[in-house]
Amino acid sequence: SLCMDFVMNHTSQEHEWAKRAVAGEREYQDRYFFFDNFDIPAQYEKTCPQVFPTTAPGNFTWLDSCHKFVMTTFYPYQWDLNYANPVVFNEMTANMLYLVNQGIDIVRIDAVPYIWKQIGTTCRNLPQVHTIVRMMRMITEIVCPGVLLLGEVVMEPSKVVPYFGTLEKPECHMLYNVTTMASTLSLIHI
């Protein structure tokens, strides 16, 4: 089986969408979280914890090239996608389907809990994330039923399990627990 890492939360700053956003194309800026000043980012920062506070502090990056802030949950060169814009979901799903039609058997969905952003929340594990994963599952079941979705959910176990979904509303076929993997690896090296 061939497994592919599918990064849904963000693109690189080198991606075509990002380059067009920096060039001032509003359609592409709307695929990300672009802001003219820090007023709205400051609202996010009140409740959204930092992933890497020492190596990549904050959740936003100032872009000198276009004089705007962009949301960057992980690193300054990884720009968060705005799934409130339906174009993002449609394009990302089309990209995933293109790749699975090239022979991918397992789609590893990277950084699943971070996909949806909402002011006043931690921007993690929100109900909309589960809806997005469920829609991906329904689409793959129809278009390419042999494909499995593997979710990367780096959270405590109580937050990992819900990404399986329910019998009526299944989400990921498989999940892995990074904490267990790291603990197992450290035991091997003792």
Residue ranges and their predicted role:
Residues 188-190:
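Conserved small/polar residues in nucleotide/adenosyl-binding loops
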Residues 107-109:
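Hydrophobic residues within beta-strands of alpha/beta enzymes
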Residues 1-93, 97, 101, 112-182:
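Acidic/aromatic-lined carbohydrate-recognition and catalytic surfaces
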Residues 103-105:
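Short loop/turn motifs at secondary-structure junctions
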